[in-house]
Amino acid sequence: MKRIYLLMVGVYLLSLSGAEEGLNFPTYDGKDRVVSLSEKNLKQMLKRYDLLCLYYHEPVSSDKVSQKQFQLKEIVLELVAQVLEHKNIGFVMVDSRKEAKLAKRLGFSEEGSLYVLKGDRTIEFDGEFAADVLVEFLLDLIEDPVEIVNNKLEVQAFERIEDQTKLLGFFKNEDSEYYKAFQEAAEHFQPYIKFFATFDKAVAKKLSLKMNEVGFYEPFMDEPNVIPNKPYTEEELVEFVKEHQRPTLRRLRPEDMFETWEDDLNGIHIVAFAEKSDPDGYEFLEILKQVARDNTDNPDLSILWIDPDDFPLLVAYWEKTFKIDLFKPQIGVVNVTDADSIWMEIPDDDDLPTAEELEDWIEDVLSGKINTEDDDNEDEDDDGDDNDDDDDDDDDNDNSDEDNEDSDDDDDDDE
């Protein structure tokens, strides 16, 4: 029954794609590749695969909605397993109730999470649970943790990676102890942070790197931050990256969106929406870059850029939740706890704020002058006005009674 259901769902989801030769989108073939993991087969699975992808889930309840949600997750995993079948990656499920002892041994704590075991490392996937995102994430994981840059064209390719944190080191050769320390450090952050290395003196000269020196490139910055006190141990590199891995301006990416969202500052995010492919969005992004470059030394500033094109399924949700129009650039403050938000007034796409105006607005945010409680205070004020209005009504009634009494007295005098 399971196989028939998954086959039908797979066909329904993917059969709308064209079937021309060379563009055959994968459809689920009905073969079960995702298995249940237990204490008995763990050792065998680890020995068999280079990577082991584990979905840690709560027990499947009897209600239909929960069952369908679980089955949709299952078909995503089955499709990914099918696409990557030739890559020696195993896919398993771990029931939190049936395999509680195993989950504790593996260090799993959050139900609904996806983990990847690679050697002695456990990597948690904190991105969108979608087949294409998962495939890209796993392909990045099976690559070498360090990519070598050998010539000018590869330098150009490296320099065009502007929206990700990256490191590049210059070493004597692959046998260098300092290069090996660099490799070990890279494994701690793969695939979320890119590590590059060169053994070419001309490349190093172009990038202004000395022997055994490593440049740390923050997203959207023109110049790298050269890590001090070379040469470095693995521990020193890891410590430096962890200390500096929250950039001034970063992009929300499907592969690590939840981890990024949880990395807030004092419970808030400064969020900017801008479509890079749209002229106004591109212009606004360039203004954001300038602000980030001018304020890169401010540890309290971190702007989260979201390109709506990266998250088409979330656009309607964001517009409803934040009460904004995502067809034009937006920047605001979002409380990560309750999604309360307040947004900068941008009256017209043709009248985007300047870098100076944006900096002034951000300064007000960081000082607390602009905050997500403003709307709540306004609501309270409105309530206060209502109470005042009620009091006024009472006063009016009292005055009316007094007028009536005066009128009665006048009538008595007439009599």
From Swiss-Prot:
Record keywords: Calcium, Glycoprotein, Metal-binding, Muscle protein, Phosphoprotein, Sarcoplasmic reticulum, Signal
Modified residues (Phosphotyrosine): Y282
Broad class of where this protein is predominantly found: other
Molecular function GO terms recorded: calcium ion binding; calcium ion sequestering activity
Domain of life: Eukaryota
Tissue localization of expression: Detected in heart (at protein level). Detected in heart.
GO cellular component terms, A-Z: junctional membrane complex; sarcoplasmic reticulum; sarcoplasmic reticulum lumen; Z disc
CDD domains in alphabetical order: PDI_b'_Calsequestrin_C, PDI_b_Calsequestrin_middle, PDI_b_Calsequestrin_N
SUPFAM superfamilies associated with the record: Thioredoxin-like
One of the GO BP terms on file: regulation of membrane repolarization during ventricular cardiac muscle cell action potential
Compositionally biased spans, kind Acidic residues: 373-415
Subcellular location: Sarcoplasmic reticulum lumen
Stretches the record annotates as Disordered: 366-415
Heme in keyword set: no
Secretion signal span: 1-19
Gene inactivation effect: Mutant mice are born at the expected Mendelian rate, are viable and display normal sarcoplasmic calcium release and normal heart function under basal conditions, but have a slower heart rate. Mutant mice are subject to polymorphic arrhythmia after exercise and to catecholaminergic ventricular arrhythmia, and their myocytes show increased Ca(2+) release in response to isoproterenol. Besides, the volume of the junctional sarcoplasmic reticulum is increased, and it seems to lack visible content.
PROSITE patterns the record matches: CALSEQUESTRIN_1, CALSEQUESTRIN_2
Glycosylated residues, chain numbering: N335
Post-translational modification: Phosphorylation in the C-terminus moderately increases calcium buffering capacity.
Family of the protein in this entry: Belongs to the calsequestrin family.
Subunit and partners: Monomer, homodimer and homooligomer. Mostly monomeric in the absence of calcium. Forms higher oligomers in a calcium-dependent manner. Dimers associate to form tetramers, that then form linear homomer chains. Interacts with ASPH and TRDN.
Role of this protein: Calsequestrin is a high-capacity, moderate affinity, calcium-binding protein and thus acts as an internal calcium store in muscle. Calcium ions are bound by clusters of acidic residues at the protein surface, especially at the interface between subunits. Can bind around 60 Ca(2+) ions. Regulates the release of lumenal Ca(2+) via the calcium release channel RYR2; this plays an important role in triggering muscle contraction. Plays a role in excitation-contraction coupling in the heart and in regulating the rate of heart beats.
Name this protein carries in UniProt: Calsequestrin-2
Native source organism of the sequence: Mus musculus
Primary gene name: Casq2
